[in-house]
Amino acid sequence: MKKLITYSSIIAVLIFGSSFNQPDAKNYYDTGLASLNQKDYIKAIGDFTNAISMNPKYGDAYFYRAYSKELLGKKMGFISTELCSDLIYSMVYGKTEASDKIGELCTGDCFNMESAFVEPEIVYCADFSSQILTDIPDGVENLQYLIKLNMFNNKLVTLSQKWSHLTKLISLDLGSNRITLLPPVIGKLTELKELNLNKNLLATLPAEIGNLKNLKTLTLRQNGLKVLPANIGTLTELEDLDLALNMLTTLPTEIENLKKLKRLILVGNEISAKEQQRIKTLLPNTTIAFE
């Protein structure tokens, strides 16, 4: 019995010890970076693929696999859109630089209503503008890599729960619709960097607008806004805010948290000289247009 216990213990130790010698996701990732630095792009892609197979939420591995594919494509004389899905997963799993790369490489060719649902897995940009739509089309859940959507000049009055499938969007154009109410579902689109709501019928914004932490551009020109929610101040990445041609008389004190805001347009609102001075004091480094 003692021998059995001894042999079993030795085998267990050997198995346990050998597991430390097996490459893990981080090992493969580091090897991939080394291969990338040596311009061995095919090997780098393989190494990052191994890392992802062990850790499917490895945002950095997706990012550098995409970068390896981009460099290999340039070397071979083509760029494959395959790298876009890698960049999207990289963004979803926390690699903030990925969204800039997506905007650079993956939003060139937009699919229209007729073609978008034929091969939904290759659709990164969709143009459904001027289609008399009252909602986003059925089947949108199949557009799993959609990052840019143009719904300009339709007949939307609100957003249905179908919009909750579009969590990878970084650019959304809802201008020139008839939206009177922006429901809480807007707060699920947390990767958005650009949101256009010009020429709608909004009188207020939901608290969930504060969930859009990555927003850089928000355009709300020509609505019926009378007040902004205090949590507009949580949009700390915001650089451009267009509130022209609304019914605003004041802005919440929380706008002072918008430290990156470069431009604020308030033309066509009923803002007194005293309130204008207050806003300038809250945003000393922002270019503000009142008229």
Ranges and model annotations:
Residues 2, 7, 16-126, 131, ...:
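Alpha-helical tetratricopeptide repeat
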Residues 11-12:
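Repetitive helical segments and hydrophobic/amphipathic motifs
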Residues 49, 134, 167, 180, ...:
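Ser/Thr-centric signal marking residues that sit
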Residues 75, 81-82, 89-102, 166-204, ...:
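A generic tandem-repeat structural signature
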Residues 120, 141-146, 164-169, 187-192, ...:
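Leucine-rich repeat
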Residues 124-127, 147-151, 169-174, 192-197, ...:
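Conserved hydrophobic beta-strand positions in leucine-rich repeat
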Residues 131-134, 157, 180, 203, ...:
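Conserved positions within tandem-repeat grammars
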